[in-house]
From Swiss-Prot:
Subcellular location: Cytoplasm
Catalytic reaction annotation: UDP-N-acetyl-alpha-D-muramate + NADP(+) = UDP-N-acetyl-3-O-(1-carboxyvinyl)-alpha-D-glucosamine + NADPH + H(+)
Protein name: UDP-N-acetylenolpyruvoylglucosamine reductase
The EC number(s) this enzyme carries: 1.3.1.98
């Protein structure tokens, strides 16, 4: 605990002791398994708790960061000053007719499972995406020719005025790895997905097919944040990186995956600096060789 010990009492009035972690290792909360500690990590179990937590942070000028499953975040080795609000406990999933209503912390694989069990088609693409609903809506996550914009009906968000709003799909401005939620810094609380009735066996078969493909082609045995770079227009990041001769390129304990060049992985107990050094080298080398700019898809937080 570094800078915000004086604020613990503020959060203690709102949280049980078990929901508060001081000087929490962020490496235990993100998929990359790297990064320094955060001053305070809070795990709310209700939307009201989330709202009140952010009010406290804003009133006391405490920096705060919101995570779901930590699958698309890299925390630097110096850690995070302030508060991390982890939404994993807000994970209810409800099926009503051909709609699924899921809270922000629900895992995409669990939403996909619920859809399959309810014989609802359209969410199979997300069966292997390791993120949560909140993060998926935030960045319009996608895979295997599917994305959130294809299935979402609306998102319930906490806006920058601490008001809860329901934003219809038409106003979410969903594009490639972007949304109005990202642009305005809103926090996703729930999402409603509009699916179609289908044949359960066929839906499961598609899930199985995508799961097998992912296992065969991606380095799932190593910590990573999935695809490291956004897809540059007209290209594939992994192909550019491979063509640049960077498969297997390593710095310290991080490297470009031999299995899929689009993944930077923590292959030998690396540090956040190792991961970032690999990312920046890959970016610079692809620019040098092909004149193409690569931008990280992973979000980078914290201090060096």
């Amino acid at each position: 605990m570094k800078h915000y010990g004086e604020y613990k009492n503020l959060f203690s009035k709102l949280y049980e002791e078990s929901q508060i972690q001081l000087d929490a290792k962020m490496s235990e909360h993100i998929y990359f398994k790297v990064g320094g500690p955060v001053d305070i990590l809070l795990t709310p179990n209700s939307i009201q708790q989330v709202k009140e937590t952010i009010t406290i942070c804003k009133e006391n000028n405490i920096p705060f960061y919101v995570i779901g499953n930590g699958s698309n975040i890299l925390v630097k080795d110096g850690g995070i000053r302030g508060v991390v609000i982890k939404l994993c406990e807000l994970n209810k999933i409800e099926c009503i007719g051909n709609k699924i209503i899921a809270e922000c912390g629900a895992l995409l694989k669990d939403v996909s499972k619920a859809a399959t069990e309810g014989s609802l088609a359209g969410f199979q693409f997300a069966c292997g995406i390791p993120g949560s609903v909140g993060g998926a809506v935030f960045m319009n996550a996608g895979a295997y020719d599917g994305e959130i914009s294809f299935v979402i009906e609306s998102a319930e968000v906490l806006d920058d005025n601490q008001e809860i709003r329901i934003i219809p799909k038409s106003e979410l401005n969903l594009g490639y790895r972007q949304s109005v939620v990202m642009q305005k810094g809103y926090i996703v609380l729930r999402a409603t997905f509009n699916l179609v009735n289908g044949d359960k066996e066929k839906i499961q078969a598609r899930v199985d097919e995508l799961t097998k493909r992912r296992e065969e082609r991606q380095p799932l045995e190593y910590p990573s944040a999935g695809s490291t770079f956004k897809r540059p227009e007209g290209y594939f990041a992994g192909k550019l990186i491979e063509d640049a001769g960077l498969k297997g390129f390593a710095i310290g304990g991080a490297c470009v995956s031999e299995k899929h060049a689009g993944f930077v992985i923590n292959c030998k107990n690396g540090t956040a600096k190792d991961v970032l050094d690999v990312i920046y080298h890959v970016r610079d080398e692809v620019k040098k060789q092909f004149g193409v700019d690569l931008y990280p898809e992973v979000r980078i937080w914290g201090e060096d």
